Curated annotation (Swiss-Prot):
The gene is PTPN1. Its main location: endoplasmic reticulum. One of its GO terms (molecular function) is non-membrane spanning protein tyrosine phosphatase activity. It catalyses: O-phospho-L-tyrosyl-[protein] + H2O = L-tyrosyl-[protein] + phosphate. It is found in: Endoplasmic reticulum membrane. It comes from Gallus gallus. This is Tyrosine-protein phosphatase non-receptor type 1. Substrate binds at D181, C215, S216, A217, G218, I219, G220, R221, Q262. The lineage of its organism: Eukaryota, Metazoa, Chordata, Craniata, Vertebrata. It is an enzyme of class 3 (hydrolase). May play an important role in CKII- and p60c-src-induced signal transduction cascades. May regulate the EFNA5-EPHA3 signaling pathway which modulates cell reorganization and cell-cell repulsion. May also regulate the hepatocyte growth factor receptor signaling pathway through dephosphorylation of MET. Residues 291-319 are annotated as: Disordered. Phosphorylated on serine and threonine residues near the N-terminus by casein kinase II (CK2). The modification Phosphoserine is found at S50. Belongs to the protein-tyrosine phosphatase family. Non-receptor class 1 subfamily.
C-alpha cells in the first residue's frame, strides 16, 4: 500500500519533523477577527488558538454568538466535525447550547480535566454524586444517566433538556482518559478500538448533527482523531484505497481550523493508525477483535490523580549521654504548616510543551469566611505546636548538658586533687633539699 511505503520512507529518513514543518508552512491562514474582539477574550482558552471567521460555529441565543469552535466539512468523506476547545467555567453553557442547536448526538473528549497539575478543561458534565447540572445562562439541564468505565476510556449516557421547550435528547459522551497532552495514545490498536466504539454508536451518522470533538485547545489530539477517521472513510469510499494522501487530507482540514495536529509524533501516529485501520477496510474483520484484546479495555482504569511517592525519611544525628545517635525524622519542621498553606493557593495558568504560558479564566471555587477562619486557626495551631516543640527540644538539650556534667564531675575532681598534691610535694622537695 502506498501509505505504508511512505511511512517507512519517512521513518528511515527520520523526516517526520521536516514534513510536519512543510504542513505548517503550506497550511491555510484566514482571518479570525471575531475571535480577536476584546469582548470575546474571556471565551478563549488560549490566545493563539482561534476559529476562522468563515468556519466558526455561531450561537443562536443571546447578544453574543461567539464560541471557540469550528465546523470542519469533509465533502468527499461525507463527514462533518465540530472541533472546539475544552470548555471554560464561563462557557460550559455555551458548549451545551452549541450541542443542542447543532443537533449533535456525540461528544468526544480526548483529555482529562486536570493534566500535569494544570486545568485543561472545566467539569462540564455531572459527576456520579451530583447527577444533574443546570446552565442558567442558556436554560439547559444535563443529567447523567449511566457510566461505563473501561481501562482507558469511559462512555457516559447523558440527557440534555431544554428547559424552555421541555424537550430532551440523549447525548453520548466518549471520554478518552489516557491520551497525554502533545502526545499519542498507547497504541494504534487502543485508539482504533475507541474510534470504532464511537462509530458503532451511530453518533457519526448523517441523520445527526456533527460530532463535537475536543481536547484542551481543540487542535492536537482532536485533529488526530478526525484525520484518522476521515482517511479511513476515504479509503473505504474510493476504488483505489492507496490513493489517499494523509498530508493532503490534513491540509484540507486545516482550511477550517488552524493548527490541526500539533506535533510530528501525532502526525506519525496518524499514519500508523490509518495503516492499521486499513486492514479492516480491506476486508480483514478479525482485526477489530484483535484491537479490543490488545487495548486491555477490561482492566482497572488508572487512578484519576496519582499521588507522588513519599519522600524518604530525613536522617539526623545528635549527641546523647556522650554518644552519637542517628534517627529518622518522619515529620520535618513546618511540613504541616507548609502543606496547609500550599493547599489554599491555586493558579489558573496553563503551560504547554513549548514553554508558553497562557492564562485562562480562573475556576470559581466556593469558600466561606468560616472555612478561612478554620484554615487560619489550623495554621496558627500548627505554628504554636512547632514553637512548643522547638522550646521542648532546647530544654532537652540543656538537660543533656547537665547530665553530661554530672557524669564527668567526680573524675575531674580526682584529677584536680592529684595535680594539686603532686605540685605540693614537688615544692616541699625543692625547699628542704636545695
Amino acid at each position: 500500500m502506498e501509505i505504508e511505503k511512505e511511512f517507512h520512507r519517512l521513518d528511515q529518513a527520520a523526516s517526520w519533523a521536516a514534513i510536519y514543518q512543510d504542513i505548517r508552512h503550506e497550511a491555510s491562514d484566514f482571518p479570525c477577527k471575531v475571535a480577536k474582539h476584546p469582548r470575546n477574550k474571556n471565551r478563549n482558552r488560549y490566545r493563539d488558538v482561534s476559529p476562522f471567521d468563515h468556519s466558526r460555529i455561531k450561537l443562536n441565543q443571546g447578544d453574543n454568538d461567539y464560541i471557540n469552535a469550528s465546523l470542519i466539512k469533509m465533502e468527499e468523506a461525507q463527514r462533518s466535525y465540530i472541533l472546539t476547545q475544552g470548555p471554560l467555567p464561563n462557557t460550559c453553557g455555551h458548549f451545551w447550547e452549541m450541542v443542542w442547536e447543532q443537533k449533535s448526538r456525540g461528544v468526544v473528549m480526548l483529555n482529562r480535566v486536570m493534566e500535569k497539575g494544570s486545568i485543561k478543561c472545566a467539569q462540564y458534565w455531572p459527576r456520579k454524586e451530583e447527577k444533574e447540572m443546570f446552565f442558567e445562562d442558556t436554560n439547559l439541564k444535563l443529567t447523567l444517566i449511566s457510566e461505563d468505565i473501561k481501562s482507558y476510556y469511559t462512555v457516559r449516557q447523558l440527557e440534555l433538556e431544554n428547559l424552555t421547550t421541555q424537550e430532551t435528547r440523549e447525548i453520548l459522551h466518549f471520554h478518552y482518559t489516557t491520551w497525554p497532552d502533545f502526545g499519542v495514545p498507547e497504541s494504534p490498536a487502543s485508539f482504533l478500538n475507541f474510534l470504532f466504539k464511537v462509530r458503532e454508536s451511530g453518533s457519526l451518522n448523517p441523520e445527526y448533527g456533527p460530532v463535537v470533538v475536543h481536547c484542551s485547545a481543540g487542535i492536537g489530539r482532536s485533529g488526530t482523531f478526525c484525520l484518522v477517521d476521515t482517511c479511513l472513510l476515504l479509503m473505504d469510499k474510493r476504488k483505489d484505497p492507496s490513493s489517499v494522501d494523509v498530508k493532503q487530507v490534513l491540509l484540507e482540514m486545516r482550511k477550517y481550523r488552524m493548527g490541526l495536529i500539533q506535533t510530528a509524533d501525532q502526525l506519525r501516529f496518524s499514519y500508523l493508525a490509518v495503516i492499521e485501520g486499513a486492514k479492516f477496510i480491506m476486508g480483514d474483520a478479525s482485526v477489530q477483535e484483535q484491537w479490543k484484546e490488545l487495548s486491555n479495555e477490561d482492566l482497572d482504569p488508572p487512578p484519576e490523580h496519582t499521588p507522588p511517592p513519599p519522600r524518604p525519611p530525613k536522617r539526623t544525628s545528635e549527641m546523647h549521654n556522650g554518644r552519637m545517635h542517628e534517627h529518622a525524622e518522619f515529620f520535618p519542621k513546618h511540613q504541616v504548616v507548609e502543606e496547609e498553606i500550599r493547599c489554599s493557593v491555586s493558579t489558573a495558568e496553563e503551560t504547554v510543551s513549548d514553554g508558553r504560558v497562557f492564562s485562562s479564566v480562573p475556576l470559581i471555587t466556593d469558600s466561606t469566611s468560616q472555612d478561612t477562619e478554620i484554615r487560619r486557626r489550623t495554621v496558627g495551631e500548627n505554628l504554636h505546636v512547632t514553637a512548643h516543640k522547638e522550646e521542648s527540644k532546647s530544654e532537652s538539650v540543656e538537660e543533656d548538658d547537665e547530665n553530661m556534667m554530672t557524669t564527668w564531675k567526680p573524675f575531674l575532681v580526682n584529677i584536680c586533687m592529684f595535680t594539686f598534691l603532686t605540685a605540693g610535694a614537688y615544692l616541699c622537695y625543692r625547699v628542704c633539699f636545695h
